[in-house]
Amino acid sequence: MTYNPRDHYFRKAKQENFAARSVFKLEEIDQKFKMFKPGQVVLDLGASPGSWSQYASKMAGEKGRVLGVDLSPVTVKLKNAVFIQADLRDLNLEDIFKEHGFVPPFDIVMSDMAPKTTGIRMTDQARSMELCELALDVARRFLKKDGHFVCKLFHSDDFGKLRDEMKKTFAKVEAVKPDSTRKISKEIFLVGLSKK
């Protein structure tokens, strides 16, 4: 199969005014697990270019809020969202929450963070795992009881360890590769449902 950057999902995202095709991965995950509800407060890690935040914003509605964090700027404008351009590892999240009027815990913590790839599979997988572990740590600290967590990672031999680690925190853990994920992609999504 030939790689086509402007595939069906790319065109659909443009038609529906989403910042990126990745929105459909989150939408598929939500359709399967019914995580999003009106009025929720959502923390989006790795928010750029903004499509996951757009989806969360739409689902949370006027009474919900979204806080997005990314190294890269997020240019989408959403009435119920705030975006911080920074390295998550350098932030004092409590200060950021207070500064922007967010009071944890969050209903959903989601991470579409990805490392800058090197082309060296093991290096890229290890960096992806580190980012997912960072996101899991944030979820453990700031996600409410019965809240949900979604994290993208590049599949590797350490995948099972991370899934087992998540099982300590969540009532149910599922691995998902949405149909909208490119066939050649090694990314997979771990979903933690109902934080203990």
From Swiss-Prot:
Q: Which UniProt keywords apply?
A: Cytoplasm, Methyltransferase, rRNA processing, S-adenosyl-L-methionine, Transferase
Q: Which Gene3D superfamilies match?
A: Vaccinia Virus protein VP39 (3.40.50.150)
Q: Which InterPro entries match?
A: RNA_methyltr_RlmE, RNA_MeTrfase_FtsJ_dom, rRNA-MeTfrase_E, SAM-dependent_MTases_sf
Catalytic center residues: 152
UniProt subcellular location = Cytoplasm
The GO cellular component terms are: cytoplasm
Cite the GO molecular-function annotations of the record: rRNA (uridine-2'-O-)-methyltransferase activity
EC assignment: the record states 2.1.1.166
Q: Record keywords: Methyltransferase included?
A: yes
- One Pfam family assigned to this protein is FtsJ
Please write the reaction equations for the catalytic activity of this protein. Answer: uridine(2552) in 23S rRNA + S-adenosyl-L-methionine = 2'-O-methyluridine(2552) in 23S rRNA + S-adenosyl-L-homocysteine + H(+)
Which SUPFAM superfamilies does this UniProt record tie to the protein?
S-adenosyl-L-methionine-dependent methyltransferases
Q: Where are the transmembrane segments?
A: none
Physiological role: Specifically methylates the uridine in position 2552 of 23S rRNA at the 2'-O position of the ribose in the fully assembled 50S ribosomal subunit.
Family matches, as PANTHER family: RIBOSOMAL RNA METHYLTRANSFERASE (PTHR10920), RRNA METHYLTRANSFERASE 2, MITOCHONDRIAL (PTHR10920:SF18)
Which protein family is it in?
Belongs to the class I-like SAM-binding methyltransferase superfamily. RNA methyltransferase RlmE family.
* The protein's name in its UniProt record: Ribosomal RNA large subunit methyltransferase E
Q: Which organism is it from?
A: Bdellovibrio bacteriovorus (strain ATCC 15356 / DSM 50701 / NCIMB 9529 / HD100)
